[in-house]
Amino acid sequence: MLVMAGLGLYDERDVTLKTLDFAKKVDKIYAEFYTAILTGTTMEKVEETLQKPITVLNREKVEYETNKLIEEAKNKDIMFLTAGDPMVATTHVDIAVEARKKGIEVVIINAPSIYSAIGITGLQLYKFGKTTSVVFPEPNYFPETPYDVIKDNLKLGYHTLCLLDIQADKERFMTANEGLDTLLKIEEKRNEKVISGETYAAVVARAGSTKPGLYYGKIKDLINYDFKSPLHCVIIPGKLHFMEEDALKYLFENI
């Protein structure tokens, strides 16, 4: 059996009772933190909560190691942990599919993810369009996909959730400031007038914690603001309902 469980967004207290129950029964627990990470806790605290050691998968050998855990799940009860919800990342969906192809029972335990946590913004979830990821630019690698996604969503009046790059193995997490700066640099190159310093944006910091940061304002004012510790994400709002306007006014710190 393969149990795929989410750890939630922030710390070990996000672990569900269902996950705790299965953790007691399984033979071994694996985890990966290359797609997301819990910034409010440590591996030691998670292990203490689950009362069992955790083997963290190596990002460089992920294909080999995930195949290994699937093979183990043929004869043992294996738990695979991820930050957020276990079925949000396509790599995790692939693991579940491959396990089922091999006739392995798969149990999925859902958990809070950024897709549910953005509800704290008061923006209506059904009005979000396609999600995009803003990555750290590298030499000869500066993808412009976020720009295109924002452009397409705005045409339809949809909000855009921009997930910011996580390089957990390097303890490098893109800040909202870096994400906004990256978007402006793409605009400077494309010059299609999709966004500018005058564009309004929302920043969510430390979603899932008891004290998340919610900030709203023009990009030119947000870009130098201190949003404090990660993780951050950016939302480019589309057409706003009057209730959403009230949410941005009263639930956010207006910059």
Curated annotation (Swiss-Prot):
Organism of this sequence: Methanococcus maripaludis (strain C6 / ATCC BAA-1332)
Listed InterPro entries: 4pyrrol_Mease, 4pyrrol_Methylase_sf, 4pyrrole_Mease_sub1, 4pyrrole_Mease_sub2, Dphthn_synthase
Function: S-adenosyl-L-methionine-dependent methyltransferase that catalyzes the trimethylation of the amino group of the modified target histidine residue in translation elongation factor 2 (EF-2), to form an intermediate called diphthine. The three successive methylation reactions represent the second step of diphthamide biosynthesis.
Stated name of the protein: Diphthine synthase
EC identifiers of the protein: 2.1.1.98
Keyword Transferase: yes
GO biological process: methylation; protein histidyl modification to diphthamide
Pathway assignment: Protein modification; peptidyl-diphthamide biosynthesis
Sequence positions that bind S-adenosyl-L-methionine: 9, 85, 88, 113-114, 164, 207, 232
Reaction(s) the record says it catalyses: 2-[(3S)-amino-3-carboxypropyl]-L-histidyl-[translation elongation factor 2] + 3 S-adenosyl-L-methionine = diphthine-[translation elongation factor 2] + 3 S-adenosyl-L-homocysteine + 3 H(+)
Domain of life of the organism encoding this protein: Archaea
Annotated CDD domains: DHP5_DphB (cd11647)
GO MF term set: diphthine synthase activity
Pfam family, one: TP_methylase
Self-association state and partner proteins as the record states: Homodimer.
Protein family (similarity comment): Belongs to the diphthine synthase family.
Keywords: Methyltransferase, S-adenosyl-L-methionine, Transferase
